[in-house]
Amino acid sequence: MMEEIDRFQVPPVNPEMKLLQDPAETSTIENETAPREPESVAINYKPSPLQVKIEKQRELARKGSVKNGTVGSPVNQQPKKNNVMARTRLVVPNKGYSSLDQSPDEKPLVALDTDSDDDFDMSRYSSSGYSSAEQINQDLNIQLLKDGYRLDEIPDDEDLDLIPPKSVNPTCMCCQATSSTACQIQ
């Protein structure tokens, strides 16, 4: 009986397997090999060049892994110690402290762009840390006017008038029944 060949499975290419072109050579080699069942049929399968190339790459990878002493899946292998960077070459920043040997020409990692430089000028306020609330309020109003916002000049009461008041006894829209009675559609 012939074995069924899966059409998605790539058959292995053996380097010792010869592709025979002449049928006369086929019969002489079959006679020289071990006796076979008379029902078996020899399959002359020629793999595609892509399959041959893939098989060669697999063989080279197997030979390389045997040479290096790493046999098995690369996922299960641990990294080699010579692949790890030396501790002296690693730059580890201190937590919250700037490096003393940092040159002044280095740029910061994050640069914030602002429209004007005087947005948060702390020199206006007193050095004691306590400044009058009026001064802060004036500064905020000036900044809001600069930015184009007039939030403090428009009262909020007008927006509250748009919300309708809730009734004490809500009624059904379809039959005007109150919440205590059952709604009946007429």
UniProtKB/Swiss-Prot annotation:
Pfam families: FAM219A. This is Protein FAM219A. Residues 123-132 have a biased composition (Low complexity). InterPro entries: FAM219. Disulfide bonds: none annotated. Belongs to the FAM219 family. It comes from Danio rerio. Residues 1-47, 59-132 are annotated as: Disordered. Residues 67-81 have a biased composition (Polar residues).
